[in-house]
Amino acid sequence: LFRSKGIYVYERKYGNKSITVLMNGTDKTQTINLTPYKEVLPTTSAHDVLTDQNIDLNKNLTLPGREMLVLEF
């Protein structure tokens, strides 16, 4: 579990699947620099299972307050 400025990031693995969850625990929209989380972000793109969209992990992410991303690799 990583925590920084109200952003929580954790990873779960099962077999050859990996899920990384990013949660904004604050009420404010936050821009997340993903560089510190490269250990749990094994590729440069991921599938967001909540929105069914592909996410580019080469750039910063914006996460609204009290929202989360569930990324599948």
Language-model features: where?
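Carbohydrate-interacting/catalytic domains
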Residues: 2-73
